[in-house]
Amino acid sequence: MKFGKSLSNQIEETLPEWRDKFLSYKELKKKLKLMEPRSVENRPNKRSRSDSNSVDTDPTVGMTKEELDFISLLEDELEKFNSFFVEQEEEYIIRLKELKDQVAKAKNSNEEMINIKKEIVDFHGEMVLLMNYSALNYTGLAKILKKYDKRTGALIRLPFIQKVLQEPFFTTDLLNTFVKECEAMLDRLFPSNKSRNLDEEGEPTTSGMVKTGTDDSELLRVPKELSEIEYMESLYMKSTVSALKVLKEIRSGSSTVSVFSLPPLPASGLEDDSWKKKVGVLEQVAK
């Protein structure tokens, strides 16, 4: 599947309030088509070493109006990514602290624990979505710049991508830390997350709890209702699964690794089904 179609599908599946925050890939392609392909003799010459050390190194010199419009839109897109990403990160810092406070004050009522777990799962899913947002937009930029270089003969892709690597939206270290903190919270609150599936391994007791061990010391009193929450119906879950599917399609599209290749996500099991187990998502919902 072509990247444009994959991106379009992802935008349709994502959170409604996020849909206008992704790369305007179609608009960039339209601007690209307005440019007249340059013949070999009219293409920019590679700078010599002496030229590259000169004062006049403005990459926009010699560009047509259409090319300048394209570059301007790219810069606007970067600003859009950064603004949205930083805003989300700042919100997540506050939300994580509130969640930790909520967990610390939580009583052992079944309803309260179910609500806390759902909040953590949704928060985890939204952060994974933002990590994928970063990777998808990076990929889109690399692909549209490749098309630009091919059409104009210019060589702006490498310097532009080098700039992108330093942008806030591309830096997901803090997000990855938050994701792992959420997983750690779930493991502490609900040790049963470490098992494969409560419905497969556990036995319901007369009190409506689920027993996962043979020793009384290993009796995990998890509300049976908890295993029946259909997290796969969660909007966060649907969006996240869709995003991961798109990224898998993108990565499988080329076996060649280069400076422009999509960087791997931090190693936290996000690209396979193991991350679902970490947040206690049941793939086979109890009937």
From Swiss-Prot:
Keyword set, alphabetical order: Nucleus
Cystines in this chain: none
Locations listed in the record: Nucleus
Entry-linked CDD domains: SPX_AtSPX1_like
Gene knockout outcome: No effect on Pi accumulation, due to the redundancy with SPX1. Spx1 and spx2 double mutants have an increased root-to-shoot growth ratio and a reduced rot hair size when grown in Pi-sufficient conditions.
BP GO terms, sorted: cellular response to hypoxia; cellular response to phosphate starvation
Domain SPX: 1-162
Region (Disordered): 36-61, 194-213
Alphabetical list of InterPro entries matching this protein: SPX_dom, SPX_prot
PROSITE patterns: SPX
Chief site of localization: nucleus
GO CC, one annotated term: nucleus
Induction trigger: Up-regulated under phosphate starvation.
Composition bias type Basic and acidic residues, residue spans: 36-50
Function per UniProt: May inhibit PHR1 DNA-binding activity in a Pi-dependent manner.
Name the record gives this protein: SPX domain-containing protein 2
Organism of this sequence: Arabidopsis thaliana (Mouse-ear cress)
Lineage, top ranks: Eukaryota, Viridiplantae, Streptophyta, Embryophyta, Tracheophyta
